[in-house]
């Protein structure tokens, strides 16, 4: 019998739903995917914007952004991280250019001077209907009426609705809204996904219906993970996304390696 993780996170639940075998390799077998170009790009952009929003509102300028980005790059290990990648999709200069373009696109989506943040990179640890959950919320903002808005920065593509359903797109933030309510009894009014590279903001209002649906996903996924751990059967979901999967690349996914014993 395999041992399931003690805690789940919104992202680990999302991974199990997209491919149970990938979840097993990452969270049970502990075979972690090494950092990639896209991972580093997203992390660097998140980090710089986090520090931008630590500035006093009137100091949240393009010039401040440049200084923060230069400092994080040179003095906090980012130059070494990016230069050390074995697979580079562009030059290091290209990485910096893409990152800075994504950061400056923030001004097309909101005005940092008047954006009122309640917190950033907030660790949340709670239980939803007996399912132990933990994770980190990118940021919590307060709307004009003081209501809570959970936001997430994205540096990748805007998902095509033909392939990504709304409940899948919003599940992680809805799960965080559930977790916040369990912790402090405060309700979240709205969710935001800020696609920085594309200058696109998607928003959705939080309703009791979509919260209830997210709660069901959490509980059912926990039950499915526990059952898979008992049986040892973690299905492989073979799709076009497999072409970008690290586990296929290193030949340990049973769907592509021909070794069914890896299941």
Language-model segment annotations:
Residues 2-18, 134-146, 209-215:
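An acidic intrinsically disordered interaction segment
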Residues 7, 63, 145, 166, ...:
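Metal-dependent nuclease catalytic regions and adjoining charged, substrate-binding loops involved
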Residues 13-14, 18-57, 96, 100, ...:
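Nuclease catalytic cores
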Residues 20-33, 80-82, 150, 156-160, ...:
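Short amphipathic alpha-helical segments and their helix-coil junctions
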Residues 22-29, 46-47, 152-157, 192-203:
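Short acidic (Asp/Glu) and glycine-rich catalytic loops that position anionic groups and cofactors
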Residues 37, 41, 95, 169-172, ...:
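Hydrophobic (often cysteine-bearing) scaffold residues that line and stabilize catalytic clefts
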Residues 48-120:
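A non-catalytic, helix-rich entry segment at domain boundaries
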Residues 119-175, 180:
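Non-catalytic protein-protein interaction segments used by genome-maintenance enzymes to assemble
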């Amino acid at each position: 019998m395999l041992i399931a993780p003690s805690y789940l996170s919104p992202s680990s639940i999302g991974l199990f739903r997209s491919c149970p075998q990938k979840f097993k390799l990452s969270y049970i077998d502990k075979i972690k995917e090494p950092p990639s170009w896209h991972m580093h790009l997203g992390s660097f952009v998140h980090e710089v914007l986090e520090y931008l929003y630590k500035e006093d509102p009137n100091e949240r300028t393009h010039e401040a952004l440049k200084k923060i980005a230069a400092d994080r790059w040179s003095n906090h290990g980012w130059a070494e991280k990016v230069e050390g990648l074995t697979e580079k999709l562009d030059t290091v200069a290209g990485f910096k250019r893409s990152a800075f373009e994504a950061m400056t696109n923030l001004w097309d989506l909101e005005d940092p001077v008047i954006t009122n943040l309640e917190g950033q990179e907030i660790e949340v640890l709670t239980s939803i209907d007996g399912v132990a959950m933990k994770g980190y919320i990118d940021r919590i903002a307060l709307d004009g009426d003081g209501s809570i808005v959970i936001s997430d920065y994205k540096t990748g593509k805007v998902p095509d609705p033909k392939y990504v359903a709304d409940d899948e797109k919003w599940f992680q933030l809805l799960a965080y809204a559930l977790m916040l309510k369990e912790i402090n009894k405060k309700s979240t009014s709205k969710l935001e996904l800020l696609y920085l590279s594309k200058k696109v903001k998607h928003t959705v209002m939080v309703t009791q219906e979509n919260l209830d649906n997210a709660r069901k996903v959490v509980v059912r996924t926990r039950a499915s993970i526990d059952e898979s751990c008992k049986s040892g059967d973690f299905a492989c979901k073979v799709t076009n996304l497999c072409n970008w999967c690290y586990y296929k690349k290193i030949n340990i996914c049973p769907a592509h390696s021909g070794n069914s014993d890896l299941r």
